[in-house]
From Swiss-Prot:
Name of the protein described by the UniProt record: Outer kinetochore KNL1 complex subunit KRE28
Top-rank taxon, per record: Eukaryota
Pfam families tied to this protein: Kre28
Family: Belongs to the KRE28 family.
Location of this chain's protein in the cell: Nucleus; Chromosome, Centromere, Kinetochore
Protein purpose: Acts as a component of the outer kinetochore KNL1 complex that facilitates microtubule-kinetochore interactions and the spindle assembly checkpoint. Kinetochores, consisting of a centromere-associated inner segment and a microtubule-contacting outer segment, play a crucial role in chromosome segregation by mediating the physical connection between centromeric DNA and spindle microtubules.
InterPro entries, per database record: Kre28
Miscellaneous remark of the record: Present with 377 molecules/cell in log phase SD medium.
Amino acid sequence: MDTGSASIKDYETVLTDIEDSIAVSSEEVLNNQELRLKNTLHEITSSILAINEENKFVNPLRNDESLDVEGKEVFVNPKILSAKIKEFNKLMELLKLTYLEQETLDYFFRFTLSSTKPLQLDSEKDPQFVKLNERVNDLKEEISNVQESKIEQIKAEIQETGHNFAERQDLINELYLEATGDIENCWDSLNELKNLTNKEDKNMMGEKDTILNSSDSDDFVEETYTNWQKLLFLQKQNQRLTKELKEMHEVKNQIIRKGEQSKKEDSGHLMANESELCQSINLLTKFWEKHFLLKGSKTTILNFEIFTQLGKVQFEIKDMQYIIAISLSDLKRPMIKDITILQKAGGNIVTDIEASSKFNNKYRNNTKVQIFEVMDDIISELTNE
């Protein structure tokens, strides 16, 4: 009797500790999630209010009941966010086009027109003006395509990261719910054991005198055997509850380990992705400055084309009669799949097998090299720079 009561009390203490620990951890996770949501909404509201200071197309709601004008509460109506975002996107497209036009004109006047030898243009139909205008349009389209591709890539990465974060958050919430359900099952089992123990104690106390005063030894043996069977049943119940408590400890440790591992993995992935993105942007900037911005009309690259659906880049080398075609194996993690060097010979275009084989052996399926480095190396070797 005393041993059984002590065991039940120990179980209750352990279950209470586990339940409190899970409740505290669950509340902390929910508070962190709510805090992140509030911070996100605050940043969105602050951004919209900042835009509203200089633009009239965003109209945040204000609490007009307050007498203090400067202290009025400002918030954003979520129902109008979709329409306002569309208007904002249209304005951003116009601003982007205007910026590209101004930037193109700036480079055009800076690197094309001479300050000492002004062009003698009769009208807009002048052949020289038409040719320069076409060149400006081509450059503008190339720059726009590259920037849009980068924007779409970054948007896709943001969406993927947000989706993964949401899945991990849902998984943590589900684990806490499952742990809470297991705790409730343990309490039910413990209460059942307590009721059975109390009932057995009452039966044993009520039948004690009858068993001792009975002259029938067979009845005494039968009662003893019955009680022994009940004790075996209670022992099995005790073993089952002990096993469930052990499983609950494992669930708790698993939740803690997954939480710590999730934080480490998220931090590592973010650092790796940011480092790789910065490296790609730096290589693209250097390549663009070297072959387009700094040289201007004297650039060695002509007819630069990007085929996004095919994962292919193609361009020509000025005054060298070379056409270079580079195919990628994967757009998400681009690796060189094939490099083809074509050479113009008379009226025909033939494949330079030796040069193609050389560059393929050097760069094919190389994950450590960026496509801009490959293009720069090919141009340098073919032009002997």
